[in-house]
Amino acid sequence: MSNYAIIKTGGKQLKVEEGSVIYVEKLNVEAGQTVTFDEVIFVGGETTKVGAPLVEGATVVGEVEKHGKQKKVVTFQYKPKKHSHRKQGHRQPYTKVVIKSVNA
């Protein structure tokens, strides 16, 4: 059984394992560089470690593959009978990360 971990990043918790691809909130790291996630909540595999709140000494290392923007979300607001309307779009930036190792 391969090692996996649950990490906290960008206000979310994600289950990751070696070789998995995750999309996280935009990180200030250039594409091609490595990023280390220190906020590890849980490590599983042959033995499990549960953090209270974090697992001591556990890290997850990944490589930034690219940065991008998600599909556009369009919001439309209007007030009936008042000839008032507003249309607004938003594209959330993200970072694509490939997990290289889970270190417990």
From Swiss-Prot:
- Recorded name of the encoding gene: rplU
* UniProt entry tagged with the keyword rRNA-binding: yes
Keyword field: Ribonucleoprotein, Ribosomal protein, RNA-binding, rRNA-binding
The record, for Pfam families, names: Ribosomal_L21p
Whom does it interact with, and what assembly results? Part of the 50S ribosomal subunit. Contacts protein L20.
Q: What is this protein called?
A: Large ribosomal subunit protein bL21
Organism of derivation = Lactococcus lactis subsp. lactis (strain IL1403) (Streptococcus lactis)
Task: Kindly give the PANTHER family that the UniProt entry links to this protein.
Answer: 50S RIBOSOMAL PROTEIN L21, LARGE RIBOSOMAL SUBUNIT PROTEIN BL21M
Family named by the database record: Belongs to the bacterial ribosomal protein bL21 family.
Any one GO CC term of the record: ribosome
Matching entries from InterPro entries are given as: bL21-like, bL21-like_sf, Ribosomal_bL21
Supply the source organism's classification.
Bacteria, Bacillati, Bacillota, Bacilli, Lactobacillales
**Function, in words:** This protein binds to 23S rRNA in the presence of protein L20.
Alphabetized GO MF terms: rRNA binding; structural constituent of ribosome
GO BP term, pick one: translation
